[in-house]
Amino acid sequence: MLEKVKNIIVVLSGKGGVGKSTVSTQLSLALRKNGFKVGLLDIDLCGPSVPYLLGLEGRDIFQCDEGWVPVYTDESQTLAVMSIGFLLKNREDPVIWRGPKKTMMIRQFLTDVRWDELDYLIIDTPPGTSDEHITVMECLKEVGCHGAIIVTTPQEVALDDVRKEITFCKKTGINILGIVENMSGFVCPHCTSCTNIFSSNGGASLANYAQVPHLGTLPIDPRVGVLAGSTTSVLDELPDSTTAEVLTHIVEKLKTIFVS
């Protein structure tokens, strides 16, 4: 039930392990800090990490007459979360499903969850361009997907997959809001200097080549990793960090694009 959702944004990545879920959760927290009501939908059925990243593991979801009730992170209900992780008895349990069953579950997440009035719904997708992505696009045809943020790392093998992601967006008519380059350099936890351990600026070069916005470059920052397992925003804990700067830039960009 997406009728009360004003803006829907999908977060995509060409490969797994690029930090897409971390970007999704911290973006959701940053939007909430800016006064927006936010929903975060984790449709990475085989690797749901959002409950862990937000410290919500073990929380239960319930059904009401209007559908599933998402898990809220706060009493004010400013951030609602739904993930298959809430349906698994143990975090280690694998989801061994064929395509049709995955498709059915994603349709349920998109049509049977009682999302209240939201300014933004962030959809954290699995890596690649699979059945899950096609199902999401089909379900969003009526209400519309308002844009996609693509997360990549600077290595060439990751950038190759992002090119496929860009092609997927163009073929399905998704507006690309921009590319985020993650894990670009390592921030020393003692002196906070940044050292490039991989190549750098690949995201910016790809954004220029594809003629889409480059939203920013995020380094590997151990201080950000410590926030996993809580609902603490980087903007609160590390306001002077590069990560907070990039997230603030993305939020400001979204505020100029969308009318809340």
Curated annotation (Swiss-Prot):
One of its GO terms (cellular component) is cytosol. Keywords: 4Fe-4S, ATP-binding, Cytoplasm, Iron, Iron-sulfur, Metal-binding, Nucleotide-binding. One of its GO terms (molecular function) is metal ion binding. Its cofactor is [4Fe-4S] cluster. It is found in: Cytoplasm. SUPFAM superfamilies: P-loop containing nucleoside triphosphate hydrolases (SSF52540). One of its GO terms (biological process) is iron-sulfur cluster assembly. Component of the cytosolic iron-sulfur (Fe/S) protein assembly (CIA) machinery. Required for maturation of extramitochondrial Fe-S proteins. The Nubp1-Nubp2 heterotetramer forms a Fe-S scaffold complex, mediating the de novo assembly of an Fe-S cluster and its transfer to target apoproteins. This is Cytosolic Fe-S cluster assembly factor Nubp2 homolog 1. It comes from Drosophila yakuba.
